[in-house]
Amino acid sequence: MITNTELEYKGNLYPNQIISFNQDVDKFNFTSENGVILQITVLRNSALRFRYATENVFEPDFSYAISEDASRGYGDLEVSEEESYYLITTTKLKVLVDKLTMRIQISDHEGNIINEDEIGFHWEENYEYGGNTVKMSKITQNAESYFGMGDKATHSN
């Protein structure tokens, strides 16, 4: 009997082509061929929540950022499917979800880009501690600054 105990290190993993889409009122779920699920929840006309799962299932729902008591609601909410993307539209925002890469672009109705994925969501399996190391790469817009939390070895922007 031959037993192979070596782990296969896969490096960075990325969502691939979206194969299914469904909508449940204000929640939009996009599932890729390799089991990544993107869930977009419309909280308000100008506030969205993005969740990702990497193995066809979400962890229990929890967020420090969203209060249970926060007011919710939106005016118009529409979704359309184009050849290469899905488009979710509220009265204030447009969210484009690329069908091939699951990358996101958020803009206002005048076409000003507010937030845009560069590489977007990706992850790496953590064999030492279990689970995944989640990564996100965004395009920085003109005059935009980024200030992250936690320890810094250099300037915080």
Q: For each predicted feature, which ranges?
A:
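N-terminal accessory segment at the very beginning of proteins
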Residues: M1-N157
